[in-house]
Amino acid sequence: MARRKDIDKDIEQKIIQEYGKCKAKILAEKYDVTLSQVYDVGKRNGLTKKCNPIFNFSETSRQIILSGILGDGRLKKNGKKNYYYSECHALGEKEYCIWKHEQLIKDDISVPTMLYGKNLNNEHNDAIEFCTRTSPSLIPYANMSKLEIIEQLNELGLLLYLLDDGWISKHSKLGNFVLCTYLLTVEERLAVTNKYNTLLGTHGHDIGHKRVDTAFSSDDNFIFFNIAKEYIPLETDIVQKKFETMLIK
């Protein structure tokens, strides 16, 4: 039987810093060690007590999580009842992923070391992912219906949802945004469209043979771009990609 490799001291220190803030399984995969080695590090350093902090959400952090549940994020249970939030993006949206993570760090919802590469051994699936600390503060989000989440989105949340799950249709010079909503029910899709149109003054409507996506007009590009300028640096990869025609002078 092959002897398991010893943990590098630098890796052990990183595990100590993150122990109790996310699942031991995540730490094992992240640092390429066994699950028992992670637990050994915790036991040797008196870290057996789990840390489940209470979060003080800023509105920006709330909107990142709410929109992410509909978009590229997910809530995962850690233990019997508490949750952590994680989100994954392709490397072409690395700066966007980092921007979101940094907003959560400001509220002590995550820490810098909880951002890591994913599938780096597969050139066709390179991605970047972050996760938050585990907390009972995320339980209410896990219990929300999609309709309740949609109702709580503000202009930032609506923009982030569009950036996560939307794309530019090139049927005109400026193009227009299309939001992928086929996973929503008819009621949820109608609620999303009404939320955009009522709160932002956009002209969203169902498209497609089965009316499962939501399209906006080219004029709505200016509305979304102006919101993006308020919150996200223009040089960020997601802004450069989704608002390319708006940035050309």
Predicted region positions:
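Internal intein/HINT superfamily modules and their associated LAGLIDADG
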Residues: A2-K5, I16, A24-E29, L35-K249
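Primarily a LysM-type cell-wall glycan-binding module
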Residues: Y19
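N-terminal positioning helix adjacent to the helix-turn-helix/winged-helix DNA-binding module
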Residues: I7-I11
